[in-house]
Amino acid sequence: MLAEGLHSIADTGNQGLLLLGLSQAKKPPSVRHPLGQGRVIYFWSFIVALMLFSMGGLLSSYEGVDRLIAPVQLASPGIAIAILLFAAIAEGISLRAAVHEINKVRGERSYWTWFKESRQSALLIVAAEDSAALAGLVFAFTAVLASAITGNPLYDALGSIAIGGLLIVVAITVSVQIKSLLVGESAAPEVRLAITRFLENSPEIIQIDSLITLQQGDQVIVLLKAEFRNEPSAIKLLADMQQIKAAFLAAFPQVEMVYMEPMIHASQP
């Protein structure tokens, strides 16, 4: 029960940190942060993973080992079981909401594939925490029930260790994914493919020489180097580029900035 209590405290603090990160990520570009602060959500997501590892995983494991060394008889198992059942219902509702949001964006991908490819760190964290919480409640319920039936506090201690181990594994797995986002990832594969097809179908563009996408929180930055059709004047070329940019931003609302570098095809009439 104490292990799940520690996990709940960490979970509550984590939600506050994610809200703080989402708020900061919405700040507009400035002189100090010319590309905006979208990636700050990755920093706070990484802090959340560390809290899950330390406050959740390590403390729960320590509590379990301590109870192995100095067993304590379980008191009021009926109340403990009732609390766990209520918590399981609440966590189930929360996880269902997270899964609903994931289903909006994962398409035909499996949940594991979405997890590995997702650029939405906040949703990733919430889904991982809720899944771990629900599994942890199952461990806690089993341990409390076994201790209540047998009168042996060993099961309660083993339950705490199991919960701690689960949280450590989840925290490390999430940290690896968040670390990749912190370093810098391109837009999701399906977004990059859609951008490429859009540009290839633009009559003003002859060939794409280089296309770089950078995920900045919920926003994407695009850097394009392409061969444009030869225009009679630089003014007409700039007009074509502005037209492409306007259509591009309308088609991809998640794109915040587009940088284009033209390479004129000399043989084009």
Q: What do these predicted regions represent?
A:
Residues 1-27, 61, 65, 124-138:
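Acidic (Asp/Glu-rich) catalytic motifs at the cytosolic membrane interface
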Residues 8-9, 33, 239:
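A general, composition-driven signal for non-globular sequence regions
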Residues 18-40, 70:
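Aspartate-rich (DDxxD/NDxxD/DxxxD) Mg2+/diphosphate-binding motifs
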